[in-house]
């Protein structure tokens, strides 16, 4: 339930966006050894609300975690809005490997 709620909080309602967020969380668990969703939220600095969950987030979590699928065939670790990225020159995200933009969110891997 917490996983579905943070996916909703980090992206909103879009199914594709929810899949990208879910994959980012899964990559943190697989590659960084986080042992819980709460640890990922704290360790990766997620700030999205955890008050609610959308059906798209529920479906995305099932697709990425339960069915072991990917949103894209590349690791995803970090994300930020394009507005944040553009308004904060030299931010952490600008030092990472840009992978894709979906709607107003940029997704990154490490170098």
Where in the sequence are the language-model features?
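Bacterial extracytoplasmic/cell-wall-associated proteins, especially those involved in peptidoglycan
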Residues: 1-111
